[in-house]
Amino acid sequence: MTGIEIDGKVVANEILQRVAVDVDALKQDGWAPTLVSIRIGDNSAVDRYVRNQQRNVSKVGIDFVEKYFPPDISEAEVHAAIVNLNVDPRITGIILQRPIPENLPIKHLQATIHPLKDVEGMHPTSIGNIVYRELELGPCTAIAAVELLRGTGLSIEGRSEEHTSELQSRTK
């Protein structure tokens, strides 16, 4: 059996093109999307990830703001910063970069981000929506996997064990 080659860069570029059109429409209506990246402490992998985020959002016209906090920041201070971003109408998306220092409760801080501003889809509400097949605000990794599968042209609706042979025959 041979596999299907999936070119993630092609899929990513298609997504970026669609997002750019949506962002342009929002800007024409007077609404400029802004993503805030919260980074706590120093981590070279996170630094690289943030640079890639900044590059990609600039490609589609989204404003990018990085909020850096020292590793010894308190939970209360991070919580307050997130709450302030939640109520700021200029901020349309928030992402909490991981890993964060071990003394901070990632689950609690992630749950502090309002579900409508939770870019990663890690708020408990967003994760719960998966059960109801509401992926509009789902976890970004899961949505990326679905987009990659869609890029193959294979039908992914209603797949179960009884459909496995059809899927296997199309991938040979």
Regions picked out by a protein language model, each given a short descriptive name:
Residues 32-41:
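Short beta-strand segments enriched in small/hydrophobic residues
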Residues 57-71:
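Short beta-strand elements in bilobed, periplasmic/extracellular small-molecule ligand-binding domains
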